[in-house]
């Protein structure tokens, strides 16, 4: 009886190994989140938007006076 149970457990372990073969994680380290836009591109965008807003304010002050 013990031998049958041992064989059954070995068969289950073997079949589990076969069904999970190839499902190995690429890395064990947690994946860090990547931004879709780089920091330099974001800084350029903020510079252009803020610069044009400041330029527009200065131009409207000159025209108003």
Curated annotation (Swiss-Prot):
- Which sequence ranges are marked TM in the entry? 38-58
Keywords for this entry? Endoplasmic reticulum, Membrane, Transmembrane, Transmembrane helix, Unfolded protein response
GO annotations of cellular component type: endoplasmic reticulum; endoplasmic reticulum membrane
Any one Gene Ontology BP term:
endoplasmic reticulum unfolded protein response
Query: What InterPro entries does this protein map onto?
Result: ER_stress-assoc
UniProt-annotated location(s): Membrane; Endoplasmic reticulum membrane
Q: Does the keyword DNA-binding apply?
A: no
**Topology class, membrane:** Single-pass membrane protein
State whether keyword Nuclease applies: no
Q: Which PANTHER family match?
A: STRESS ASSOCIATED ENDOPLASMIC RETICULUM PROTEIN SERP1/RAMP4, STRESS-ASSOCIATED ENDOPLASMIC RETICULUM PROTEIN 2
Q: Which family does it belong to?
A: Belongs to the RAMP4 family.
Q: Any idea what job this protein has?
A: Interacts with target proteins during their translocation into the lumen of the endoplasmic reticulum. Protects unfolded target proteins against degradation during ER stress. May facilitate glycosylation of target proteins after termination of ER stress. May modulate the use of N-glycosylation sites on target proteins.
What does the record note on quaternary structure? Interacts with SEC61B, SEC61A1 and the SEC61 complex. Interacts with CANX.
Q: What is this protein called?
A: Stress-associated endoplasmic reticulum protein 2
Q: Which organism is it from?
A: Bos taurus (Bovine)
